[in-house]
């Protein structure tokens, strides 16, 4: 499941799109101009006897990503990966900067705010992509609001402002009984997906991980989820051909859906931000493929 940012004060139908798609998009990236001065000397003449400066102006792509829920388990991994890849990062969350220390934290702009009451004009200025990790649990209405309405609000704000790409982290398409899939957690996330893919049909990205593992910090204390997730991941990889047929059994995904390393999920997000042809819905396997592409 996605890491969840606590939106406690935050008082449809599933999308018809199936699978990832690839097609060039028409949006213009954020650019800045780089000027290089060169000298040129004619044949037979020394550079001292005749030379003239030539100004070369080149357009260079520069990414600026706004991460909603950037101080959470998944969000902080995304921020860290973005910084490592030379991407400017703005994090938006209700509690601001995380309460642990790391060298990359000072390179992120930490904004404290509620997605429903943000000054989007300030937050989205210059953004080339928005990444949302917003999600959480609670009662039925809270889950619809946190997982659905909060993300729908963010999608519409980004679209209205003209941000060219939006990446949404939701949840694996579990083969659970309908009465479970109809609760606010799942319906909220699917409603958010539908809104994203309708507003960003050729540049919206939906990543659907299952259990996410890694070293999670809770109130400054490290919780090593990788002690469980990493061995499971290796077992599932080695036994994939035996496990795959069993995944058609009702509710089998709860046990048999492969876990995802939080760093792999973060790299898949970076791939989505950098690759203009990367859009659509991405499964657990496709998330891992995108991460491998970034590591290659």
Curated annotation (Swiss-Prot):
DNA repair as UniProt keyword: no
Protein name, per record: Uncharacterized protein At1g32220, chloroplastic
One GO cellular component, as annotated: chloroplast
Intracellular or extracellular location(s): Plastid, Chloroplast, Plastoglobule
Family classification: Belongs to the NAD(P)-dependent epimerase/dehydratase family.
Gene Ontology terms describing biological process: response to oxidative stress
Disulfide bonds: none
Chief place where the protein resides: plastid
FT transit peptide: 1-57
Pfam families noted in UniProt: NAD_binding_10
This protein's UniProt keywords: Chloroplast, Plastid, Transit peptide
Domain of life: Eukaryota
């Amino acid at each position: 499941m996605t890491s969840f940012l606590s939106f406690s004060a935050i008082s449809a139908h599933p999308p018809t799109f199936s699978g990832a798609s690839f097609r060039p998009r028409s949006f213009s990236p954020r650019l800045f101009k780089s000027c290089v001065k060169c000298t040129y000397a004619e044949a037979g003449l020394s550079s001292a006897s005749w030379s003239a400066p030539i100004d070369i102006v080149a357009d260079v792509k520069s990414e600026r990503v706004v991460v909603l829920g950037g101080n959470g388990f998944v969000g902080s991994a995304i921020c860290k990966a973005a910084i490592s890849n030379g991407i400017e990062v703005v994090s938006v969350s209700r509690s601001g900067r995380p309460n642990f220390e790391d060298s990359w934290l000072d390179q992120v702009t930490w904004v404290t705010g509620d997605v429903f009451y943000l000054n989007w004009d300030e937050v989205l200025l210059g953004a080339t992509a928005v990444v949302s990790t917003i999600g959480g649990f609670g009662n039925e209405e809270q889950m619809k609001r946190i997982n659905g309405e909060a993300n729908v609000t963010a999608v519409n704000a980004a679209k209205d402002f003209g941000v060219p790409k939006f990446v949404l982290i939701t949840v694996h398409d579990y083969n659970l009984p309908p009465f479970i899939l109809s609760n606010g957690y799942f319906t909220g996330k699917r409603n958010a997906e539908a809104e994203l893919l309708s507003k960003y049909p050729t540049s919206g990205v939906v990543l659907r991980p299952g259990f996410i593992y890694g070293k999670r910090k809770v109130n400054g204390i490290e919780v090593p989820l990788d002690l469980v997730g990493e061995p499971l991941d290796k077992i599932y990889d080695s036994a994939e051909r035996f496990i795959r047929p069993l995944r058609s059994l009702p509710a089998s995904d709860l046990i048999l859906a492969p876990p995802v390393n939080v760093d792999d999920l973060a790299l898949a997000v970076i791939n989505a931000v950098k690759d203009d042809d990367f859009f659509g819905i991405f499964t657990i396997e496709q998330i891992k493929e995108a991460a491998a592409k970034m590591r290659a």
